[in-house]
């Protein structure tokens, strides 16, 4: 009778692999299981080999990102929500810097590419809501603006999570996103307030306006 796989062992090995990446140490069968209490056979049991480890590690990065974005509550202010998604993206990178190093390494395929695509589609839907609400011009391409917004979050996150800048540098997201969204047609003052509400909160999941009472007008 086949033994049931223990999800905790899989998570343990993924965390170990991420730690090795963060420490810039080689990720091999032996280094992966060292100090974990499991054998090298577990790598084959749970991942089919080292290539499977890298695929799963990339996927885990997007799984955690998706969970972070899903925790951002939808408010009556779509521009605030768009900024909050960017803030959640940056926060995820800072909280999981080792996984963040691996997420965008296209040397190994993702187990579920659709899950990665969904993270961008959340931003696209927020842009579409902003257009419907009259915040952005009708000629704005949702995918294009969402990608530009993602690029800003990705750049700041990379410089803070794995680069030379301090955490405080994330505050630059407010003026940069404000400039981007104003260029898409939003009113400058209203846009600034929306972005500050979305990007400036430490916990984007808890920052949704209640009943629209603090949505900018």
What residue spans do the PLM features occupy?
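All-alpha amphipathic helical-bundle segments outside canonical DNA-binding/catalytic cores
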Residues: 80-83, 114-118, 132-148, 168-171
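Alpha-helical DNA-contacting segments of helix-turn-helix folds
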Residues: 21, 53-61, 103, 119
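C-terminal peripheral helix-coil segments that are non-catalytic and often amphipathic
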Residues: 121, 125-133, 165-217
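Generic hydrophobic, amphipathic alpha-helix propensity
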Residues: 8-17, 32, 57-61, 65, ...
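Short secondary-structure transition hinges
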Residues: 91-132, 158, 167
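Hydrophobic alpha-helical connector segments
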Residues: 70-99, 120, 149
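Amphipathic alpha-helical linker/stalk segments
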Residues: 59-82, 114-118, 129
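Helix-turn-helix
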Residues: 12, 20-52, 56
């Amino acid at each position: 009778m086949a033994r049931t796989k223990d999800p905790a062992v899989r998570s343990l090995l993924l965390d170990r692999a991420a730690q090795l990446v963060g420490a810039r140490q080689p990720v091999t069968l032996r280094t992966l299981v060292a100090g974990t209490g499991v054998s090298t056979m577990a790598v084959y049991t749970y991942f089919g080999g080292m290539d499977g480890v890298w695929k799963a590690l990339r996927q885990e990065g997007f799984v955690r990102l998706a969970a972070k974005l899903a925790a951002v509550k939808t408010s009556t202010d779509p521009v605030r929500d768009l900024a909050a998604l960017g803030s959640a993206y940056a926060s995820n990178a800072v909280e999981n810097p080792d996984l963040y190093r691996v997420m965008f390494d296209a040397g190994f395929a993702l187990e579920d590419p659709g899950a990665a695509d969904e993270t961008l589609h959340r931003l696209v839907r927020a842009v579409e809501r902003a257009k419907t609400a009259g915040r952005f011009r009708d000629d704005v391409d949702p995918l294009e603006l969402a990608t530009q917004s993602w690029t800003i979050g990705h750049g700041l996150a990379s410089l803070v999570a794995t680069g030379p800048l301090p955490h405080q540098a994330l505050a630059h997201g407010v003026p940069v996103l404000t400039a981007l969204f104003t260029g898409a047609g939003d009113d400058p003052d209203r846009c600034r307030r929306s972005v500050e509400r979305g990007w400036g909160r430490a916990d984007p999941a808890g920052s949704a306006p209640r009943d629209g009472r603090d949505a900018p007008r």
